Amino acid sequence: MLRRYLTLSFSSLLLLALLFLTGCSFVRPQFRRGFRTQFKINSIPTVSDPYHINYDLTFSLNFASNKRNTYGTGWLIDWKGDENNPEKNDPFKVYLATNLHVIDALRNNNDYEPYNKDSNNQAFNSEEITRFFSIGKYTYPSIFSELNFIINAREAFVSIQTSTIPKTAYAAVNFVETQGEDESYTDSLSTDNKRDIYADFAVIEIPLFLTNHRDYQVFNEFIKPAIETYKQLGNSSFEKKQLDQHKNDNFYMLGYPLVESSIDALILNQRRQYNNSYTEKYTPQTLTKDQRTIDLSREVPTLIQNKTENSTGSQLLVNQSLSSTSEGIIEFIKLPEFKLNYHNKSYRQYGRGFALQNTNFRPGSSGTLMLNNQKQIAGIYFGVLDFGEDVSLMSNIGVGQILRVPQKNNTRNRSIATNKSNYDLIFGDSNTTNFYAKFARQNNTHLYQMISNSKDTKLKYVNTVEKTVKASIK
């Protein structure tokens, strides 16, 4: 009875709240005028700072079509190629994790199937096709020699337009075999709600042709430092804990919300002399933005850390009235209002999430990496709950999607999970049918090489799946 009461209490409170997804599609929103925040902004972490890992791995993403301009945050999760001796003829491929709602703006006719069409298997509307993409970072502009004649600032936001439009490596839709955390609850859901589900997680592929000047700048100044930091995390970089073991975690977050700012900000765009002829497998960029576009708009991707004068990191909101358990864990299956339209089809959110105290990051920060005390990747930030004028409900509640939820090993505590709630969006498990390691294996990326060399059998589930499929074919 107590669990039901808490669940109903949480649901009713959420009906009073608005979930703001923090990947944004807008031009100069007026409500962000005079931006103020308690968090530390526009400060590059030192090497000894715990946020330095987040900084090296994290980038601002910008997608544009004829109809909209979308910003989000992404972080390095994988790559393909030797960063120390890259191929000259083949692109170096970078894989960045972000939110699914951010890559709704990625619509590429040359994308991998099934992402080269919308979720209803229909061709994209020409006005929706992605024409522009850039990847940016708050950094030292002096590393780009051409900027020494343009800008005198020691630090600035620099965004670089790549030569081609990214592709979709992974989208977390319909990713589990069994939707059964609470069978009495799921039985009451409509058939459509049971079928089409999502987690707010995706991975994009950015091909970098290193003979292209801008692509090489992205590779050399952004990606290589990120790879070096990624390797330092080691094979245990992806957290997988029982849900009740998160209560003492502290989450470090660094992202790029789009807010009014006076910082120097520039776009290094593609120029005619940089363009090469690419194979039909890739989509060259057809739209460029003037180098001063961001600077003139004054709505600038702004480096932010969940660090204040009095605290570092975010902790779970351990409050019985504001979470479906007493441990700050959200069960999305019980919140049917958590929905997303991805590529013209509606999905219902599934899985588990973190309810984060005092973590109100603004739009543009969607996709922010959540790193725990042990320097492990625990989740991905995607939005904030807002209760309007009722500050007693703690309006600054951030929400993140947990990436890996193990099978429950404590049958006595029914408020945490049941044995059908497990999933693993990265490496897969017995209940996960759609996970990133499948793509990594098929394309022999760095992550799959790590899986192959690992002694941890839990990371090798993708090989079991492939063997099972081959055996069934025989």
From Swiss-Prot:
<feature type="signal peptide">
    <location>
        <begin position="1"/>
        <end position="23"/>
    </location>
</feature>
<keyword id="KW-0732">Signal</keyword>
<dbReference type="InterPro" id="IPR009003">
    <property type="entry name" value="Peptidase_S1_PA"/>
</dbReference>
<dbReference type="GO" id="GO:0005886">
    <property type="term" value="C:plasma membrane"/>
</dbReference>
<keyword id="KW-0564">Palmitate</keyword>
<keyword id="KW-0449">Lipoprotein</keyword>
<feature type="lipid moiety-binding region" description="S-diacylglycerol cysteine">
    <location>
        <position position="24"/>
    </location>
</feature>
<keyword id="KW-1003">Cell membrane</keyword>
<dbReference type="InterPro" id="IPR022382">
    <property type="entry name" value="Mycoplasma_peptidase_DUF31"/>
</dbReference>
<comment type="similarity">
    <text>Belongs to the MG067/MG068/MG395 family.</text>
</comment>
<feature type="lipid moiety-binding region" description="N-palmitoyl cysteine">
    <location>
        <position position="24"/>
    </location>
</feature>
<keyword id="KW-0472">Membrane</keyword>
<dbReference type="Pfam" id="PF01732">
    <property type="entry name" value="Mycop_pep_DUF31"/>
</dbReference>
<protein>
    <recommendedName>
        <fullName>Uncharacterized lipoprotein MG068</fullName>
    </recommendedName>
</protein>
<dbReference type="InterPro" id="IPR022381">
    <property type="entry name" value="Uncharacterised_MG067"/>
</dbReference>
